[in-house]
Protein backbone atom coordinates (compact mmCIF):
# COMPACT_ATOMS: atom_id res chain seq x y z
CA UNK A 1 0.00 0.00 0.00
CA UNK A 2 1.46 3.34 -1.07
CA UNK A 3 1.78 6.01 1.58
CA UNK A 4 -0.56 8.94 0.94
CA UNK A 5 -3.12 11.03 2.83
CA UNK A 6 -5.54 8.09 2.92
CA UNK A 7 -3.07 5.40 3.98
CA UNK A 8 -0.99 7.34 6.53
CA UNK A 9 -1.23 5.86 10.02
CA UNK A 10 -0.90 9.18 11.80
CA UNK A 11 -3.65 11.78 11.29
CA UNK A 12 -0.88 14.39 11.30
CA UNK A 13 0.35 13.05 7.96
CA UNK A 14 -3.10 11.95 6.79
CA UNK A 15 -6.28 13.83 7.57
CA UNK A 16 -4.51 16.94 8.86
CA UNK A 17 -1.55 17.07 6.49
CA UNK A 18 -2.77 20.34 5.02
CA UNK A 19 -2.42 21.96 8.44
CA UNK A 20 0.91 20.37 9.34
CA UNK A 21 2.72 20.44 6.02
CA UNK A 22 4.98 23.34 7.03
CA UNK A 23 6.51 21.19 9.78
CA UNK A 24 7.88 18.63 7.32
CA UNK A 25 10.82 20.95 6.64
CA UNK A 26 11.90 20.52 10.27
CA UNK A 27 10.73 17.15 11.55
CA UNK A 28 10.46 14.72 8.65
CA UNK A 29 13.07 12.01 8.06
CA UNK A 30 14.26 14.07 5.10
CA UNK A 31 14.64 17.12 7.34
CA UNK A 32 16.62 15.24 10.00
CA UNK A 33 19.01 13.89 7.38
CA UNK A 34 19.43 17.37 5.90
CA UNK A 35 20.19 18.88 9.30
CA UNK A 36 22.78 16.17 9.91
CA UNK A 37 24.44 16.97 6.59
CA UNK A 38 24.42 20.67 7.50
CA UNK A 39 26.11 20.06 10.86
CA UNK A 40 28.74 17.76 9.33
CA UNK A 41 29.55 20.27 6.58
CA UNK A 42 29.76 23.23 8.93
CA UNK A 43 31.95 21.22 11.30
CA UNK A 44 34.37 20.35 8.50
CA UNK A 45 34.51 24.00 7.41
CA UNK A 46 35.18 25.11 10.99
CA UNK A 47 38.06 22.62 11.26
CA UNK A 48 39.47 24.17 8.08
CA UNK A 49 39.11 27.64 9.56
CA UNK A 50 40.96 26.62 12.74
CA UNK A 51 42.98 25.38 10.82
CA UNK A 52 44.07 21.87 11.55
CA UNK A 53 47.55 21.39 10.06
CA UNK A 54 46.34 18.76 7.59
CA UNK A 55 43.55 21.06 6.39
CA UNK A 56 45.64 24.11 5.58
CA UNK A 57 45.57 23.13 1.92
CA UNK A 58 41.78 23.38 1.63
CA UNK A 59 40.89 26.31 -0.61
CA UNK A 60 38.41 28.58 1.17
CA UNK A 61 36.63 29.03 -2.14
CA UNK A 62 35.23 25.50 -1.78
CA UNK A 63 33.32 26.41 1.38
CA UNK A 64 30.31 27.68 -0.56
CA UNK A 65 30.38 24.57 -2.73
CA UNK A 66 30.34 22.49 0.43
CA UNK A 67 27.45 24.49 1.87
CA UNK A 68 25.49 23.95 -1.33
CA UNK A 69 25.44 20.25 -0.48
CA UNK A 70 22.88 20.96 2.25
CA UNK A 71 21.41 24.11 0.76
CA UNK A 72 20.47 22.21 -2.40
CA UNK A 73 19.82 18.93 -0.61
CA UNK A 74 17.28 16.87 -2.54
CA UNK A 75 15.08 13.87 -1.91
CA UNK A 76 17.42 11.93 -4.19
CA UNK A 77 20.30 12.84 -1.88
CA UNK A 78 18.31 11.71 1.14
CA UNK A 79 17.43 8.47 -0.61
CA UNK A 80 21.12 7.89 -1.37
CA UNK A 81 21.87 8.20 2.34
CA UNK A 82 19.04 5.76 3.15
CA UNK A 83 20.50 3.32 0.62
CA UNK A 84 23.89 3.57 2.31
CA UNK A 85 22.21 3.09 5.69
CA UNK A 86 20.64 -0.14 4.45
CA UNK A 87 24.21 -1.47 4.28
CA UNK A 88 25.78 0.24 7.31
CA UNK A 89 22.70 -0.10 9.54
CA UNK A 90 23.81 3.23 11.00
CA UNK A 91 22.10 6.48 10.02
CA UNK A 92 24.84 8.97 10.94
CA UNK A 93 27.63 6.85 9.43
CA UNK A 94 25.60 6.82 6.23
CA UNK A 95 25.72 10.64 6.20
CA UNK A 96 29.52 10.52 6.55
CA UNK A 97 29.85 8.11 3.62
CA UNK A 98 27.50 10.24 1.52
CA UNK A 99 29.66 13.31 2.13
CA UNK A 100 32.77 11.38 1.14
CA UNK A 101 31.03 10.62 -2.15
CA UNK A 102 30.26 14.32 -2.56
CA UNK A 103 33.93 15.16 -1.89
CA UNK A 104 34.89 12.70 -4.63
CA UNK A 105 32.57 14.49 -7.06
CA UNK A 106 34.17 17.83 -6.24
CA UNK A 107 37.68 16.59 -6.99
CA UNK A 108 40.82 17.61 -5.18
CA UNK A 109 39.34 16.75 -1.78
CA UNK A 110 40.58 13.19 -1.40
CA UNK A 111 43.24 14.09 1.18
CA UNK A 112 40.64 15.69 3.43
CA UNK A 113 37.82 13.14 3.48
CA UNK A 114 38.84 11.56 6.78
CA UNK A 115 38.21 14.86 8.53
CA UNK A 116 34.50 14.48 7.88
CA UNK A 117 33.03 13.51 11.27
CA UNK A 118 36.54 13.75 12.73
CA UNK A 119 36.64 12.87 16.44
CA UNK A 120 32.86 12.91 16.73
CA UNK A 121 30.23 10.48 17.90
CA UNK A 122 26.76 10.23 16.39
CA UNK A 123 25.19 12.22 19.20
CA UNK A 124 27.41 15.20 18.40
CA UNK A 125 25.44 15.31 15.16
CA UNK A 126 22.02 14.30 16.49
CA UNK A 127 22.15 16.50 19.58
CA UNK A 128 22.92 19.50 17.40
CA UNK A 129 20.60 18.67 14.50
CA UNK A 130 17.49 18.12 16.63
CA UNK A 131 17.72 21.31 18.75
CA UNK A 132 18.50 23.23 15.56
CA UNK A 133 15.35 21.83 13.94
CA UNK A 134 13.32 22.72 17.04
CA UNK A 135 14.77 26.24 17.10
CA UNK A 136 13.88 26.87 13.47
CA UNK A 137 10.43 25.26 13.76
CA UNK A 138 9.66 27.48 16.74
CA UNK A 139 10.86 30.61 14.98
CA UNK A 140 9.35 29.96 11.58
CA UNK A 141 6.13 28.04 12.32
CA UNK A 142 5.13 27.94 15.99
CA UNK A 143 5.79 31.54 17.06
CA UNK A 144 4.03 33.13 14.06
CA UNK A 145 0.96 30.93 14.57
CA UNK A 146 0.65 31.42 18.32
CA UNK A 147 1.19 35.15 17.86
CA UNK A 148 -1.59 35.19 15.25
CA UNK A 149 -3.88 33.56 17.82
CA UNK A 150 -2.92 36.11 20.45
CA UNK A 151 -3.54 38.94 17.97
CA UNK A 152 -7.03 37.62 17.22
CA UNK A 153 -7.82 37.42 20.92
CA UNK A 154 -6.52 40.94 21.46
CA UNK A 155 -8.74 42.22 18.64
CA UNK A 156 -11.78 40.69 20.33
CA UNK A 157 -10.70 42.00 23.73
CA UNK A 158 -10.63 45.52 22.34
CA UNK A 159 -13.86 45.09 20.36
CA UNK A 160 -15.76 43.77 23.39
CA UNK A 161 -14.12 45.95 26.03
CA UNK A 162 -17.41 47.67 26.98
CA UNK A 163 -19.66 44.58 26.91
CA UNK A 164 -20.83 43.80 30.49
CA UNK A 165 -21.23 40.13 31.27
CA UNK A 166 -22.35 38.03 34.20
CA UNK A 167 -19.38 36.20 35.68
CA UNK A 168 -19.67 32.62 36.91
CA UNK A 169 -17.64 31.19 39.78
CA UNK A 170 -18.34 27.61 40.82
CA UNK A 171 -20.88 27.70 37.98
CA UNK A 172 -22.96 30.24 39.88
CA UNK A 173 -23.58 33.96 39.22
CA UNK A 174 -20.79 36.21 40.50
CA UNK A 175 -19.85 39.88 40.30
CA UNK A 176 -20.28 41.08 36.70
CA UNK A 177 -17.25 41.49 34.49
CA UNK A 178 -16.61 42.67 30.95
CA UNK A 179 -16.33 40.27 28.04
CA UNK A 180 -13.29 42.06 26.64
CA UNK A 181 -11.49 41.78 29.96
CA UNK A 182 -12.16 38.04 30.16
CA UNK A 183 -10.67 37.58 26.69
CA UNK A 184 -7.74 39.75 27.75
CA UNK A 185 -7.01 37.26 30.53
CA UNK A 186 -6.02 34.75 27.86
CA UNK A 187 -3.96 37.32 25.95
CA UNK A 188 -2.07 38.09 29.15
CA UNK A 189 -1.51 34.45 30.05
CA UNK A 190 -0.41 33.42 26.57
CA UNK A 191 1.97 36.35 26.22
CA UNK A 192 3.57 35.62 29.59
CA UNK A 193 4.05 31.93 28.86
CA UNK A 194 5.27 32.64 25.34
CA UNK A 195 7.91 34.98 26.79
CA UNK A 196 8.96 32.19 29.14
CA UNK A 197 9.27 29.78 26.23
CA UNK A 198 11.34 32.24 24.22
CA UNK A 199 13.68 32.71 27.18
CA UNK A 200 14.53 28.99 27.31
CA UNK A 201 18.00 28.44 25.83
CA UNK A 202 18.25 25.83 23.11
CA UNK A 203 21.38 23.88 23.89
CA UNK A 204 23.40 21.20 22.14
CA UNK A 205 25.79 18.45 23.13
CA UNK A 206 29.10 18.51 21.26
CA UNK A 207 32.12 16.84 22.85
CA UNK A 208 33.00 13.42 21.49
CA UNK A 209 32.24 9.89 22.59
CA UNK A 210 31.77 10.62 26.30
CA UNK A 211 31.75 14.42 26.33
CA UNK A 212 35.48 14.87 27.02
CA UNK A 213 36.91 15.53 23.53
CA UNK A 214 39.10 12.45 24.05
CA UNK A 215 39.75 11.85 20.35
CA UNK A 216 40.26 15.52 19.56
CA UNK A 217 42.69 16.00 22.42
CA UNK A 218 44.76 12.89 21.75
CA UNK A 219 45.19 13.89 18.09
CA UNK A 220 45.72 17.62 18.61
CA UNK A 221 46.48 18.41 22.28
CA UNK A 222 47.64 21.90 21.37
CA UNK A 223 44.11 23.12 20.61
CA UNK A 224 41.49 24.31 23.11
CA UNK A 225 38.70 22.02 22.00
CA UNK A 226 36.17 23.27 24.52
CA UNK A 227 36.54 26.79 23.17
CA UNK A 228 36.34 25.40 19.64
CA UNK A 229 33.12 23.54 20.45
CA UNK A 230 31.56 26.55 22.12
CA UNK A 231 32.38 28.75 19.15
CA UNK A 232 31.23 26.22 16.55
CA UNK A 233 27.88 25.54 18.22
CA UNK A 234 27.18 29.23 18.87
CA UNK A 235 28.42 30.82 15.65
CA UNK A 236 27.60 28.15 13.09
CA UNK A 237 24.41 26.69 14.59
CA UNK A 238 23.02 29.48 16.76
CA UNK A 239 22.82 27.20 19.79
CA UNK A 240 24.52 27.05 23.19
CA UNK A 241 26.90 24.18 23.94
CA UNK A 242 26.33 22.19 27.11
CA UNK A 243 29.64 22.37 28.97
CA UNK A 244 29.42 19.06 30.85
CA UNK A 245 27.72 16.03 29.31
CA UNK A 246 27.97 12.29 28.88
CA UNK A 247 27.78 10.88 25.36
CA UNK A 248 24.43 12.57 24.91
CA UNK A 249 22.76 15.85 25.70
CA UNK A 250 21.57 16.43 29.24
CA UNK A 251 18.25 17.43 27.66
CA UNK A 252 17.43 19.61 30.67
CA UNK A 253 16.93 22.74 28.60
CA UNK A 254 14.97 20.85 25.95
CA UNK A 255 12.80 19.58 28.79
CA UNK A 256 12.23 23.19 29.86
CA UNK A 257 11.14 24.04 26.31
CA UNK A 258 8.64 21.18 26.30
CA UNK A 259 7.32 22.18 29.73
CA UNK A 260 6.84 25.77 28.56
CA UNK A 261 5.00 24.58 25.46
CA UNK A 262 2.82 22.37 27.64
CA UNK A 263 1.84 25.34 29.82
CA UNK A 264 0.86 27.28 26.70
CA UNK A 265 -1.24 24.27 25.68
CA UNK A 266 -2.93 24.36 29.08
CA UNK A 267 -3.86 28.02 28.62
CA UNK A 268 -5.23 27.26 25.15
CA UNK A 269 -7.28 24.34 26.50
CA UNK A 270 -8.74 26.66 29.13
CA UNK A 271 -9.54 29.24 26.46
CA UNK A 272 -11.19 26.72 24.14
CA UNK A 273 -13.32 25.32 26.95
CA UNK A 274 -14.48 28.80 27.96
CA UNK A 275 -15.52 29.76 24.44
CA UNK A 276 -17.24 26.37 24.10
CA UNK A 277 -19.17 27.18 27.30
CA UNK A 278 -20.06 30.70 26.14
CA UNK A 279 -21.50 29.19 22.95
CA UNK A 280 -23.49 26.73 25.07
CA UNK A 281 -24.79 29.69 27.10
CA UNK A 282 -25.78 31.36 23.80
CA UNK A 283 -23.46 34.32 24.40
CA UNK A 284 -22.13 33.59 20.93
CA UNK A 285 -23.72 32.25 17.81
CA UNK A 286 -21.61 30.71 15.06
CA UNK A 287 -21.36 31.67 11.43
CA UNK A 288 -23.04 29.07 9.27
CA UNK A 289 -21.42 27.83 6.08
CA UNK A 290 -23.72 26.57 3.34
CA UNK A 291 -23.42 22.85 2.75
CA UNK A 292 -21.92 21.98 6.12
CA UNK A 293 -23.61 19.40 8.35
CA UNK A 294 -23.52 19.56 12.16
CA UNK A 295 -24.99 16.15 12.93
CA UNK A 296 -25.76 13.02 10.93
CA UNK A 297 -29.10 12.78 12.77
CA UNK A 298 -30.08 16.27 13.95
CA UNK A 299 -30.34 18.76 11.08
CA UNK A 300 -30.49 21.83 13.34
CA UNK A 301 -27.08 21.32 14.95
CA UNK A 302 -24.24 23.85 14.64
CA UNK A 303 -21.63 22.38 16.94
CA UNK A 304 -18.51 24.11 18.34
CA UNK A 305 -16.35 21.49 16.64
CA UNK A 306 -13.31 23.72 16.12
CA UNK A 307 -12.89 24.37 19.84
CA UNK A 308 -13.41 20.66 20.54
CA UNK A 309 -10.87 19.69 17.88
CA UNK A 310 -8.35 22.11 19.37
CA UNK A 311 -8.89 20.82 22.90
CA UNK A 312 -8.42 17.22 21.80
CA UNK A 313 -5.24 17.88 19.87
CA UNK A 314 -3.76 19.96 22.68
CA UNK A 315 -4.38 17.09 25.08
CA UNK A 316 -2.52 14.65 22.84
CA UNK A 317 0.33 17.14 22.36
CA UNK A 318 0.69 17.77 26.09
CA UNK A 319 0.77 14.05 26.85
CA UNK A 320 3.66 13.56 24.43
CA UNK A 321 5.46 16.69 25.64
CA UNK A 322 5.17 15.39 29.20
CA UNK A 323 6.84 12.11 28.23
CA UNK A 324 9.58 13.89 26.30
CA UNK A 325 10.17 16.19 29.25
CA UNK A 326 10.49 13.50 31.93
CA UNK A 327 12.14 10.79 29.83
CA UNK A 328 14.86 12.53 27.84
CA UNK A 329 16.93 13.82 30.82
CA UNK A 330 17.22 10.24 32.17
CA UNK A 331 19.77 7.88 30.60
CA UNK A 332 21.76 5.01 32.11
CA UNK A 333 25.33 5.96 33.04
CA UNK A 334 27.03 7.66 30.09
CA UNK A 335 24.26 6.77 27.66
CA UNK A 336 21.60 4.31 26.61
CA UNK A 337 19.66 4.36 23.36
CA UNK A 338 16.19 5.12 24.69
CA UNK A 339 16.50 8.81 23.85
CA UNK A 340 17.04 8.04 20.16
CA UNK A 341 13.61 6.62 19.36
CA UNK A 342 11.86 9.05 21.71
CA UNK A 343 13.58 12.04 20.11
CA UNK A 344 12.26 11.03 16.70
CA UNK A 345 8.79 11.94 17.97
CA UNK A 346 9.59 15.58 18.71
CA UNK A 347 7.66 16.72 15.65
CA UNK A 348 4.49 14.90 16.71
CA UNK A 349 3.39 17.33 19.47
CA UNK A 350 4.29 20.23 17.19
CA UNK A 351 1.90 18.75 14.64
CA UNK A 352 -0.97 18.44 17.09
CA UNK A 353 -0.31 21.95 18.40
CA UNK A 354 -0.42 23.66 15.00
CA UNK A 355 -3.63 21.75 14.23
CA UNK A 356 -5.04 23.06 17.52
CA UNK A 357 -3.95 26.65 16.93
CA UNK A 358 -5.54 26.68 13.48
CA UNK A 359 -8.73 25.09 14.80
CA UNK A 360 -8.86 27.65 17.62
CA UNK A 361 -8.49 30.48 15.13
CA UNK A 362 -11.18 28.99 12.91
CA UNK A 363 -13.54 28.72 15.87
CA UNK A 364 -12.83 32.25 17.05
CA UNK A 365 -13.43 33.69 13.59
CA UNK A 366 -16.85 32.01 13.43
CA UNK A 367 -18.10 33.79 16.54
CA UNK A 368 -21.07 36.14 16.38
CA UNK A 369 -21.66 38.11 19.58
CA UNK A 370 -25.18 37.64 20.97
CA UNK A 371 -25.64 40.66 23.24
CA UNK A 372 -29.30 39.80 23.78
CA UNK A 373 -28.42 36.61 25.66
CA UNK A 374 -25.64 38.31 27.62
CA UNK A 375 -27.90 41.17 28.72
CA UNK A 376 -30.76 38.79 29.48
CA UNK A 377 -28.63 36.97 32.04
CA UNK A 378 -27.57 40.25 33.61
CA UNK A 379 -31.16 41.48 33.83
CA UNK A 380 -32.23 38.22 35.45
CA UNK A 381 -29.57 38.31 38.14
CA UNK A 382 -29.91 41.40 40.29
CA UNK A 383 -28.57 39.48 43.28
CA UNK A 384 -25.02 40.17 42.05
CA UNK A 385 -25.27 43.83 43.07
CA UNK A 386 -25.56 42.74 46.71
CA UNK A 387 -21.77 42.84 47.03
CA UNK A 388 -21.73 46.46 45.86
CA UNK A 389 -24.50 47.54 48.24
CA UNK A 390 -23.04 45.87 51.31
CA UNK A 391 -19.57 47.26 50.56
CA UNK A 392 -20.87 50.85 50.42
CA UNK A 393 -22.85 50.25 53.61
CA UNK A 394 -19.68 49.00 55.29
CA UNK A 395 -17.97 52.18 54.22
CA UNK A 396 -20.75 54.12 55.95
CA UNK A 397 -20.47 51.99 59.13
CA UNK A 398 -23.99 50.68 58.62
CA UNK A 399 -24.71 47.90 61.16
CA UNK A 400 -24.42 44.32 59.86
CA UNK A 401 -24.56 45.12 56.11
CA UNK A 402 -23.33 41.71 54.95
CA UNK A 403 -25.90 39.90 57.05
CA UNK A 404 -28.69 42.19 55.82
CA UNK A 405 -27.87 41.48 52.17
CA UNK A 406 -27.44 37.79 52.89
CA UNK A 407 -30.93 37.65 54.38
CA UNK A 408 -32.28 39.33 51.25
CA UNK A 409 -30.45 37.35 48.58
CA UNK A 410 -29.63 33.91 49.99
CA UNK A 411 -33.12 32.51 49.52
CA UNK A 412 -34.94 30.57 46.86
CA UNK A 413 -36.93 33.66 45.94
CA UNK A 414 -36.07 35.54 42.76
CA UNK A 415 -34.13 38.73 43.37
CA UNK A 416 -35.35 41.40 40.98
CA UNK A 417 -34.66 45.02 40.26
CA UNK A 418 -37.78 45.87 42.25
CA UNK A 419 -36.74 43.89 45.34
CA UNK A 420 -33.29 45.47 45.32
CA UNK A 421 -34.77 48.96 45.04
CA UNK A 422 -37.25 48.21 47.80
CA UNK A 423 -34.35 47.14 50.01
CA UNK A 424 -32.45 50.34 49.24
CA UNK A 425 -35.44 52.54 50.05
CA UNK A 426 -35.84 50.82 53.40
CA UNK A 427 -32.29 51.55 54.49
CA UNK A 428 -31.70 54.03 57.31
CA UNK A 429 -29.10 56.07 55.42
CA UNK A 430 -28.83 59.55 53.94
CA UNK A 431 -30.53 60.29 50.63
CA UNK A 432 -27.14 60.83 48.98
CA UNK A 433 -26.15 57.28 49.85
CA UNK A 434 -29.43 55.97 48.44
CA UNK A 435 -28.77 57.87 45.20
CA UNK A 436 -25.37 56.21 45.01
CA UNK A 437 -26.93 52.79 45.51
CA UNK A 438 -29.77 53.31 43.03
CA UNK A 439 -27.43 53.70 40.04
CA UNK A 440 -25.79 50.33 40.65
CA UNK A 441 -27.07 47.70 38.21
CA UNK A 442 -25.75 44.38 36.92
CA UNK A 443 -24.79 46.28 33.74
CA UNK A 444 -22.76 48.96 35.51
CA UNK A 445 -21.21 47.01 38.37
CA UNK A 446 -18.26 45.71 36.32
CA UNK A 447 -15.24 47.11 38.13
CA UNK A 448 -12.37 48.77 36.30
What are these regions (language model features)?
Residues 134-135, 142, 183, 250, ...:
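Amphipathic alpha-helical coiled-coil segments and their boundaries
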Residues 181, 255-263, 388-395:
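Short, well-ordered beta-strand elements within core beta-sheets of diverse protein domains
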Residues 2-213, 220-232, 294, 307-309, ...:
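A helix-coil-helix interface module used to build multimeric assemblies
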Residues 193, 240-242, 246-332:
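Glycine-rich anion/phosphate-binding loop at the beta-strand->alpha-helix junction
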Residues 223-247, 251:
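Active-site-adjacent "gating/activation" loops or surface patches in catalytic cores
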Residues 2-29, 61-71, 293-448:
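Catalytic-core signal marking the mid-to-C-terminal active-site face
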